[in-house]
Regions:
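Short helix-capping and inter-helix turn/linker motifs at the boundaries of alpha-helical repeat units
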Residues: 59-61
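Hydrophobic protein-protein interaction segments
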Residues: 9, 53-54
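Conserved amphipathic alpha-helical segments that form helical-bundle/coiled-coil interaction surfaces
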Residues: 1-48, 64-72, 80-94
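C-terminal effector-binding regulatory domain of bacterial HTH transcription factors
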Residues: 78-120
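Short secondary-structure boundary micro-motifs
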Residues: 2-4, 54-57
């Protein structure tokens, strides 16, 4: 659980730095707006997923997205960076579905108890 806590801290820092380094007021406002939505923050499900067998794979996918977006930015490939971040944001929806399906660690995300999977 300690490793997941460290990941949450580092992940939040990465996203904050990426946001800050963009130096784009409209982009910063939009990311701040979206991040404030329920279940949409960068690490919204990390702790709730910590006991799942898929947790490691999910984190590796997210980290790979981070590496790819940094590479795209370094190479001035704006469209690629945008596409990668759009895909990265879709992980939140995937993670929400996984959290609803598994219902583990509801104590960490009490609002999940209000949601039902499409199978219910």
């Amino acid at each position: 659980m300690e490793a997941f806590s460290a990941y949450v801290t580092m992940n939040a820092r990465f996203h904050a730095l990426l946001n800050e380094l963009s130096a784009s007021s409209p982009l910063i406002r939009e990311i701040d707006r979206v991040s404030a939505l329920p279940f949409a923050s960068p690490s919204a499900f990390v702790m709730a997923q910590s006991a799942l067998p898929e947790a490691h794979q999910i984190l590796l996918i997210g980290q790979d997205h981070h590496r790819i977006v940094v590479d795209a930015i370094e190479n001035r490939e704006g469209a690629r960076a945008e596409a990668v971040m759009r895909e990265h944001s879709r992980l939140a929806a995937r993670n929400l579905r996984l959290a609803i399906r598994n219902r583990t660690h509801l104590d960490l995300l009490p609002a999940l108890a209000l949601l039902k999977s499409s199978a219910e």
